[in-house]
């Protein structure tokens, strides 16, 4: 059965990098068949897998051809180890609603049977916090059953993760979606592992993996590749392989218990995150 996973987190935290490196590790180290659906108007959710951004997004094609004329072959691109990729894209700058574009794109992919039964994983790489109904669609309408939040030990990353948990609580009962854990994408701040572990325990989940900071990630990105494709022998590739393994084996999905603002402030003060 295909597992459908939504990835959320604060803007700039490294969601797309983490998602693509995890997808590559699933394919390379664990022989999994993966589909990555980018739900960000920037259309940068698949560039490391494809070796560059696609020339046209799904929404570009909808505007040019009309949704009824679009086929899977038009929009699905294959990259590293045959990982399938789609970028939703968005409206023209200053016009329309990007969240609405996500809804249109996912609906169209489902209507066209893009998420085939032979896939092991479908990833939805979502824009930032759950700030509007469109970007919340993967969890709101049950498109994804599993959610992982990318965070770090930085104050705003923790705040964003807590807000995302509030959105999960709102939609969990109607869509049967659960939080699989927090992925700590390290920024090398003081007490990072401890603060994220305390936060995850407080909201009723776990830190599924601590991804260390390593310059090899940036080197791979400069070459438009995931770490696994660029340097599979490096320790960082093995870290993503371990994260992939934990996701494969994970069977604990919860409705989180978001913290109050006072509880968050207390934790921030305790770990000096606000310094």
Curated annotation (Swiss-Prot):
SUPFAM superfamilies: P-loop containing nucleoside triphosphate hydrolases (SSF52540). One of its GO terms (molecular function) is metal ion binding. The modification ADP-ribosylarginine is found at residue 100. It comes from the Bacteria. Keywords: 4Fe-4S, ADP-ribosylation, ATP-binding, Iron, Iron-sulfur, Metal-binding, Nitrogen fixation, Nucleotide-binding, Oxidoreductase. Its cofactor is [4Fe-4S] cluster. It catalyses: N2 + 8 reduced [2Fe-2S]-[ferredoxin] + 16 ATP + 16 H2O = H2 + 8 oxidized [2Fe-2S]-[ferredoxin] + 2 NH4(+) + 16 ADP + 16 phosphate + 6 H(+). The key enzymatic reactions in nitrogen fixation are catalyzed by the nitrogenase complex, which has 2 components: the iron protein (component 2) and a component 1 which is either a molybdenum-iron protein, a vanadium-iron, or an iron-iron protein. Belongs to the NifH/BchL/ChlL family. Homodimer. This is Nitrogenase iron protein 3. It comes from Azotobacter vinelandii. The gene is anfH.
């Amino acid at each position: 059965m295909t597992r459908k996973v939504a990835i959320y987190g604060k803007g700039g935290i490294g969601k797309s990098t983490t998602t693509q490196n995890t997808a590559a590790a699933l394919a390379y180290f664990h022989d999994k068949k993966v589909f990555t659906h980018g739900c960000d108007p920037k259309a940068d959710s698949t560039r490391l897998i494809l070796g560059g951004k696609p020339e046209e997004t799904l929404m570009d094609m909808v505007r040019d051809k009309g949704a009824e004329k679009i086929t899977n072959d038009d929009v699905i691109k294959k990259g590293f180890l045959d990982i399938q990729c789609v970028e939703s894209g968005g409206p023209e700058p200053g016009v329309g609603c990007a969240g609405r574009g996500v809804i249109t794109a996912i609906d169209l992919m489902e209507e066209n049977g893009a998420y085939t039964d032979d896939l092991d994983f479908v990833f939805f790489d979502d824009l930032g916090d759950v700030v509007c109904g469109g970007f919340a669609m993967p969890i709101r309408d049950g498109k994804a059953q599993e959610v992982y939040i990318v965070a770090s030990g930085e104050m705003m990353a923790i705040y964003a993760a807590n807000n995302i948990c509030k959105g999960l609580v709102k939609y969990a009962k109607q869509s049967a979606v659960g939080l699989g854990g927090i992925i700590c994408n390290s920024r090398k701040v003081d007490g990072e592992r401890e603060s994220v572990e305390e936060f995850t325990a407080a909201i009723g989940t776990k830190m599924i993996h601590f991804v260390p900071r390593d310059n090899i990630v940036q080197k791979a990105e400069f070459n438009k590749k995931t770490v696994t494709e660029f340097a599979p022998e490096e320790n960082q590739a093995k870290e993503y392989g371990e994260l992939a393994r934990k996701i494969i084996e994970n069977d604990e999905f919860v409705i989180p218990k978001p913290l109050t603002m006072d509880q968050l402030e207390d934790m921030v003060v305790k770990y000096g995150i606000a310094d």
